[in-house]
Curated annotation (Swiss-Prot):
Residue numbers bearing the Phosphoserine modification: 59, 292, 347, 421, 423
InterPro entries hit by this protein: NEXT_complex_subunit_ZCCHC8, PSP_pro-rich, Znf_CCHC
Positions with biased composition (Pro residues): 395-409
Protein name: Zinc finger CCHC domain-containing protein 8 homolog
Key words, A-Z: Metal-binding, Nucleus, Phosphoprotein, Zinc, Zinc-finger
Length: 553
């Protein structure tokens, strides 16, 4: 029998060990399990073994020639019961032991053996007998509204190990890396020593450039520097982002279409909220000052800033002319005016900041001992007359006779007029004011009675001519009655003054300069001149901007 054949039997076997160095439990290629019956059979019948061996060799050669594989070894069983019970276990053990080698195991139930062949050619794949297969198991239906659809695909493989990808990664790392500021030598640029300890020859131009670069890099801590992602704006997509997302120039992103179903993003609505600080302001008379965008009685703690409402083209703002509204493809409704930015702001109600509004200043109440100026009295009379003219649209009264001239001033004992009479007192001015108000009331009552007595059918030209002189005479009589009869010495035109100075002329202006030094503005502040003009221009621009916002609202 060949040395590569292994015989297995459950009965007590005798083991023939070729090499003495093999440990217990270890199998070698030279170990052969032989039944005791086979030993006796070998001794008694050697010619039959040769015949069986030849027969087996011929059968093995036939199988190898047919399959094209070379035989490696065989496992033969003595009894059929042992073959049926141990066949699967032996096959699994052999396949696991020789999994890394190209070995195929075949069982032969007729000869009660398992053969191992080395694969020399690939086995042809078995062609399926059926042309097609019908799947009878139903699949879960997808919701097309929640699954985005893409019109473009990328067939290229994103290989992270390519040179371009490595270069882009390195650039991104370099951009994000922010090394700590280290002091370096202005002359050679080395960070290990300073300019004082530099051994290389001094280059003044290089030192000057390095110093300028160092000083320009320093910034004030309170200056609002530009953020890293400050250029990103919501609702606006840059060209690079559009190219990365695979959208063309006139194509709207999918998120803008989904907003038509989901509405305005709540996170950006929270961003537009402006909460009050809770600080109350009071004016001079003790009443609380309301803000420019609030009204009295409001108790809201927050409002919405209109300028922070984001515009999304295709959702709350009309898209550009070159954009195509592909709402049917995305299964969303078309653009609706009810979702526009203006209607959304209206839906917020009164909780909206409409910009700065200038309010009128509340006049403080005048003190009781304050003397009203004649200009104020005249202004109030003019306003009163204007109100009467606006209320009554009757024709004006005929011209009345001018009032009589005041009596000549009385002469003093010396026969000369005094240089100037004293001004009237406060009581006299109040009495004159009351008399003038009474005259106006009388004139208003006459006008109302005349309007009631007139009718478009009864009046004629003769009655008008008769009523005119009588009204003029009555007005003259009342004016003569109401004229003051208090005598006075002299009359001067102009604004009456209650008190006069005892000095006839003002002092010389040079006297005020004694002991006063000249003021030198911004003496200890270099490069600070011209700030007043800059502040004026800034306030002017702010004023114009506020007026523009008020006009827009």
């Amino acid at each position: 029998m060949d040395n590569s054949v292994i015989l297995i039997d459950d009965s007590q076997n005798s083991v023939v060990i070729v090499d003495d160095d093999v440990e217990d439990g270890e199998l070698e290629d030279d170990v052969v399990f032989v039944c005791p019956e086979e030993l006796t059979r070998k001794e008694i019948e050697p010619p039959t073994d040769k015949i069986e061996e030849k027969h087996s060799n011929t059968s093995i050669q036939d199988t190898t020639e047919e399959d094209g594989d070379s035989l490696v070894f065989e496992v033969r069983f003595n009894k059929e019961a042992h073959f049926t019970s141990l066949q699967q276990q032996v096959l699994v053990a052999l396949e696991g032991a020789f999994a890394d080698k190209q070995i195929v195991f075949r069982d032969n139930p007729q000869e009660l053996m398992i053969s191992a062949f080395e694969r020399s050619r690939t086995l042809p794949e078995e062609e399926p007998q059926d042309l097609f297969l019908i799947d009878t198991q139903p699949a879960a239906k997808l919701n097309a509204a929640n699954v985005p659809s893409y019109k473009r695909c990328n067939a290229d493989i994103l290989d992270e190990q390519t040179e371009e990808r490595k270069k882009l990664k390195a650039e991104a790392v370099n951009k994000c890396f922010r090394p700590k500021a280290q002091s370096s030598c202005f002359n050679c640029g080395d960070t290990e020593h300073s300019l004082r300890d530099c051994t290389k020859p001094r280059n003044n131009s290089r030192i000057t450039r390095a110093r300028k670069k160092m000083t320009s890099r320093t910034e004030r801590y309170h200056v609002d520097t530009e953020q890293r992602f400050g250029h990103i704006r919501p609702g606006k997509i840059s060209t690079k982002t559009r190219h990365a997302m695979g959208y063309s120039r006139g194509q709207l992103p999918f998120i803008f279409y989904r907003m038509r179903v989901l509405g305005y993003p709540p996170a950006w609505l929270e961003e537009a909220k402006v909460q009050s600080s809770g600080i109350a302001l009071f004016n001079a008379d003790g009443s609380e000052v309301t803000k420019s965008d609030e009204e009295e009685g409001e108790s809201e703690t927050f409002k919405y800033d209109v300028n922070k409402i984001v515009e999304y083209p295709g959702f709350n703002v009309q898209p550009k002319a070159n954009c195509f509204d592909d709402f049917k493809h995305h299964n969303v409704p078309p653009f609706q005016e009810s979702q526009s930015k203006e209607n959304f702001i209206k839906s917020l109600g009164e909780n909206v900041i409409n910009g700065y509004k200038r309010k009128k200043l509340v006049d403080l109440p005048a003190p009781h001992d304050r003397v009203p100026a004649p200009s104020e009295l005249l202004t109030s009379f003019d306003d009163y007359d204007m109100e009467l003219e606006e209320e009554t649209e009757d024709p004006p009264l005929p011209p009345s006779v001018p009032p009589p001239q005041p009596p000549p001033p009385e002469e003093c004992e010396d026969g000369e007029l005094t240089a100037r009479s004293p001004s009237p007192s406060l009581e006299d001015l109040k009495a004159q004011q009351e008399e003038l108000l009474q005259e106006l009331d009388v004139n208003a009552s006459h006008n109302t009675t005349a309007n009631e007595s007139k009718s478009p059918t009864d009046l004629d030209d003769t009655s008008e001519t008769e009523v005119g002189p009588s009204a003029a005479e009555s007005g003259n009589n009342e004016q003569s009655r109401s004229a003051p009869s208090t005598p006075f010495k002299a009359s001067y035109e102009g604004t009456p003054l209650l008190k006069f100075s005892v000095y006839d002329r003002l002092p010389v202006g040079s006297n005020f300069k004694v002991g006063v030094s000249d003021v030198i503005n911004f003496e200890n502040l270099p490069d600070s001149t011209g700030k007043y003009e800059q502040m004026k221009d800034l306030l002017k621009n702010v004023r114009e901007k506020m007026v523009k916002l008020q006009n827009e609202n």
